[in-house]
Amino acid sequence: MASTFKITFLGTGGSVPKPGRGLPAIAVQVDNIVNLFDCGEGTQKQFMKSGVSFMNVKNIFISHFHGDHFFGLPGLLSTFSFNGRIDDLNIFGPPGTIDEIKKVLSLIDFKITYNIKIAEMEENKKYDFDLFDVYAIKNDHTKYGYSYKLKEKDLIKINREKADSIGFPKNKLELLRNNGEYYYMGKRYSIWDVADGIKPGRSIVYSGDTRPFNDMLKFASNCDVLIHDSTMDASIENLANEYGHSTARQAAEIALKANVKRLFLFHYSSRYNDLNLLLNEAKSIFNDSYLSREMLEFNVDKKTELIKI
């Protein structure tokens, strides 16, 4: 399992920036791989203020193509080249992503020094990134968009005594773990022959811009961290929903029903100078609710439970 599993909030506002509150961008670091969820205007500058190296960004996931979620791409992609990047970059998003990213690239009038791979993700399909998997589902916004889940791979705990009892060599256990099976002395061994149980991986769900929708309950079920659209407060719920957003109360209701461990409110309307109104509203429903703040880092702890098999 990964040694580092860390969220850094680079921008937490919605639509219009404010001093100290930039546009949506979230870095999720899994060991030395940085995954960027959305890239609002000024994201590259936010990286420079943070403790996260933008040169380690390997994957970018765009939730939808409203400007506040991707206008930071031209600058960031340009700066990669200015800094001599040669490593491949992957950009993922909903249907239409390929055309939108081509438009972004047309704004850059010098040579890109690295290869950019663009992919339109399919709903509910598992995308394998070695240490973790990423899933996407369509949410409920005014523009076609995705919610994302990044889930660390489960760790199969090996029982060395079981291996000894069936005559499987200890120096081949990692090969068995990595491949799921291994042939030794003409006999096929399965990882389950020596497994003691499963340590579940950590998981983060990012809603993107969305009204509340039922599929989120299953998608976010039991996740460690839910980062959810909380654009407005409950007194203007109809307005929030009309514009394809959620209130802090609605985000908390989803967190409660989905049995998540922690909720971070996100994508605040610029009408709010004091965010405690949103926080208190959420906490009245789901106590483990927190405000996302720029440069806030949150390390997701490894799970200690072992699911016996």
Swiss-Prot record:
This is Ribonuclease Z. The keyword Cytoplasm does not apply. Zn(2+) 2 binds at D68, H69, D209, H267. Its cofactor is Zn(2+). Coiled coil: none annotated. Homodimer. Zn(2+) 1 binds at H64, H66, H141, D209. The gene is rnz. Binds 2 Zn(2+) ions. One of its GO terms (molecular function) is 3'-tRNA processing endoribonuclease activity. It comes from the Archaea. It comes from Picrophilus torridus (strain ATCC 700027 / DSM 9790 / JCM 10055 / NBRC 100828 / KAW 2/3).
